[in-house]
Amino acid sequence: MLIIACPGQGSQTQGFLLPWLEAYPQLEGNLASLGKACGADLVRLGTTAEEEEIKDTANAQRLIVGSALAVYRSVFAGVKVDGALGHSVGEYAAAAIAGVIGDHEAMQLVAKRADAMAEAAAKTPTSMAAVLGGEETEVLSAIEQFELEPANFNGSGQIVAAGAKSAIQRLVESPPDKSRVIELKVAGAFHTSFMESAKQSVAQLAESFSPVDPEINLWSNVDGGLAKDGSAFLSSLVSQISNPVRWDKCMTSLSGLGATVIELPPAGALAGLVKRGVSDATAIALKTPVDVEKVPIS
């Protein structure tokens, strides 16, 4: 079983698209088309843009989803893929790969999402922090104690907390027992109630689309379950903006399938989580075009 994993925000690195553009000439046209749909120069962002520019939420989300889709269309054209899933904004790429929405529709939604989340983040000083290790019940208790919210359940003993920046700093200073806390370099408290205004903004645009049911297996960040209804999955993309990412449940769903999980660029984080959390899966991160040779496709 061949499954495509689409990365989330924070995976991008300066110039990561350069080797892909050299190896796949058609990629530039794909990126240009997707960039036009979302109002961004994806080729420049993925090649010559400075690191600070691609860290910006408005740019990062466009670049990550656009790159994943462009590489997928260039590398996997004609390849039978059995399923797809994404982490956070990566779900928009997964939705397009599964045929629920078109590539350009995905980019339009991502553009609205990125801008709305950046705007919401600018209203209040908020942040996020990864809690590594510790007992889950104790970690969640500490998150609640500091009036924070769990934003990501990544599995492998990693939960991301989010909320007021001052509260995040207190959590860093007083980590739960047997854990360490690392503040993340992000613009705000994504996947929490602080993003409610962004959710409403994206919902208005989503209402104008006509999604269809997925053509392949498509797992949801809501509960790790398989999506059957395209309209319901699109609604879940919207609701997830202010709700936690349950990547842990996605990995539970992958367990027992004996799947080969291919992470699209910018790759690395999800493949690492799958390697640690799904014992019978083979995870391949497409960091450079050389990694495509590892994929069992003909």
Language-model-detected regions and their locations in the chain:
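Alpha/beta catalytic cores of group-transfer enzymes, especially the acyltransferase/condensing modules
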Residues: 9-11, 36-38, 98-242, 272
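Short, high-confidence coil segments that cap the C-terminus of an alpha-helix
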Residues: 178, 258-259
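Short, charged, surface-exposed secondary-structure boundary motifs
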Residues: 194, 291-298
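Amphipathic coiled-coil/heptad-repeat helices and related helical stalk/stem segments
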Residues: 246-247
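Small/polar (Gly/Ser/Thr/Ala-rich) solvent-exposed segments
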Residues: 254
